[in-house]
Amino acid sequence: MATKVKENEEAENERDGATDGPLLDLSDDAVKKMIKAAKKRGYVTMDELNSVLPSEEVTSEQIEDTMAMLSDMGINVIEDEDAEEAAPAEDDGDSDNEESEGGELAPSGGTALATAKKKEPTDRTDDPVRMYLREMGSVELLSREGEIAIAKRIEAGRETMISGLCESPLTFQALIIWRDELNEGTTLLREIIDLETTYSGPEAKAAPQFQSPEKIEADRKAAEEKEKTRRLRAPTGDEDVTDVGGDGLPPEEEEEDDDESNLSLAAMEAELRPQVMETLDTIADTYKKLRKLQDQQVEARLACTGTLSSGQERRYKELKDQLITAVKSLSLNQNRIDSLVEQLYDISKRLMQNEGRLLRLAESYGVKRDSFLEQYHGAELDPNWMKSITNLAARGWKEFAREESNTIREIRQEIQNLSTETGISIAEFRRIVSMVQKGEREARIAKKEMVEANLRLVISIAKKYTNRGLQFLDLIQEGNIGLMKAVDKFEYRRGYKFSTYATWWIRQAITRSIADQARTIRIPVHMIETINKIVRTSRQMLHEIGREPTPEELAEKLAMPLEKVRKVLKIAKEPISLETPVGDEEDSHLGDFIEDKNALLPIDAAIQANLRETTTRVLASLTPREERVLRMRFGIGMNTDHTLEEVGQQFSVTRERIRQIEAKALRKLKHPSRSRKLRSFLDS
């Protein structure tokens, strides 16, 4: 295998136009036997693989696709059987679970594709797809245990971030505002809390012992049976938008589940509202008590009278713990958490700007950075800080305090206002911000690892949706967006592999983007579903009757009104650009061959031009007054014709005189010397 890869890489540089077809013929008995044995063992040796590969030269892309296909099946490619002894085999129980709709196999643990990537040539390439695939191949796939470990890190990071938010008085202030909005009816409960998580209670987030291994295995088998049953009922053919729902259900079942979901949300909201309102009221009452102690603490630090008494400190800690417990029990909506984090970061940014301004001012007088930080930290709210720095003997301090006293007081007043706004000391605020940033950073890093390890899954799904109006890179991008949503929603305690769960999110993201972006004139998703249903049925009937079905036959087959079928078929037609090149030389466009109903035929245009020229010559043979009267009466060379009265006003004569001039001019035109020139136009 290694020799074949090297030979094919050299051959690839000589012929760029090689075709990329599948290397393994899955209908061949030898290939079937090899794959069956490899699935049972979890690996295949290179010698075994070489024995079933075709003898003709192939491209490195074909070998890469073959390695990826085997990896998707859960088969590792190794040099020899001795190398497999060090690597644990995949659990057989996950192999069925990895299979998704349409017979597609989702990636599982293994490093086959990463091994294949190492065998690729290291020459530079400008192709963005190849660069993306090469970078993607450097990340190893995750096993089930690896997915659980990363999911736990995401959960721990989120827990750290929420714990930090729960210690911020800004969170309690926001909760009180949200409670008032709920009472006023301006906000829905589902916009503030995560209904499903709050409804399921602590058991939903508890340790795995709340779900026994037997329960997890039973759920997994039930899901597999449901998937197999659905796949048997599904029609054959390409996958369409109608095949993919939010939960991987057929359209009919998905619609029913959507109704049930909407009903359940309303029911959960009605059931949880009293409990949530009671919790919010408790938070409001407890926070009022805590706020009094916080104000006393800040005032004590500003007045340099020390801190709270031991009893007050103990009471402060008790109230704080009660608030944190109450807030965590709410399971806030992610959008609300993001708004709280953004508010916290905004105040932190303003604090850093003021402190940075003060530091730069001190450094301009020669104060060393370390010396400034030593004197400043811990004394942010000390009203006697100006006096203390004036007495310092270190370089620059006295000049700094003397020359910039007004600016220093102004900056420190702004910092004090921020402390009052947050309700806690600056040091405590910094600790909370650091805690939130740490949790957010850990969760983000873990999510990034999970996403990068499953990029192959997006590629394998996106390949099925090419030639549908979007570029391959656009499909990958939309699939990656779905993958990131799947990472956010993944619940590892349910016992399923991440690939099984993420497949539906990726497919829905891709199919929805095709429906929204692929057409020049956007068609609603529900109409796209109807179009795909008719197209699929038409393709099926084509195989049955040997010709394209008529609209009447489609309407009868689908039990649809004939007018609706005709309307859908009309909408389904793709628009084509009038600038489409025509011919080999591409010197003309499609629009050049479309008849313009409003344009004159060339012969008619020539006749009209000749008539205009002849009429002008004939009229010129009359007197100027007669010519002008005829032109005005018949609108020749003018925007409109004129009445006898209007012409008379122009010449300051009566209408009767104009009638006489007109009659005389017409008699002159009827003379054979003039009428002969115009009679030919009348005959034509």
From Swiss-Prot:
PROSITE patterns linked: SIGMA70_1 (PS00715), SIGMA70_2 (PS00716)
Biased composition (Basic and acidic residues): 1-18, 117-129, 214-228
Assembly: Interacts transiently with the RNA polymerase catalytic core.
Region of interest (Sigma-70 factor domain-4), residue spans: 618-671
Span list, region Sigma-70 factor domain-3: 529-605
DNA-binding region: 644-663
Subcellular location: Cytoplasm
Pfam families: Sigma70_ner, Sigma70_r1_1, Sigma70_r1_2, Sigma70_r2, Sigma70_r3, Sigma70_r4
Region (Disordered): 1-25, 83-129, 203-262
Major subcellular site: cytoplasm
Biased composition (Acidic residues): 83-102, 250-261
Motif position, Interaction with polymerase core subunit RpoC: 474-477
Alphabetical UniProt keywords: Cytoplasm, DNA-binding, Sigma factor, Transcription, Transcription regulation
Protein name: RNA polymerase sigma factor RpoD
Cellular compartments per GO CC: cytoplasm
GO biological process per UniProt: DNA-templated transcription initiation
Origin: domain of life: Bacteria
Family assignment from sequence similarity: Belongs to the sigma-70 factor family. RpoD/SigA subfamily.
Sigma-70 factor domain-2: annotated segments: 450-520
GO molecular function list: DNA binding; sigma factor activity
Free-text function comment from the UniProt entry: Sigma factors are initiation factors that promote the attachment of RNA polymerase to specific initiation sites and are then released. This sigma factor is the primary sigma factor during exponential growth.
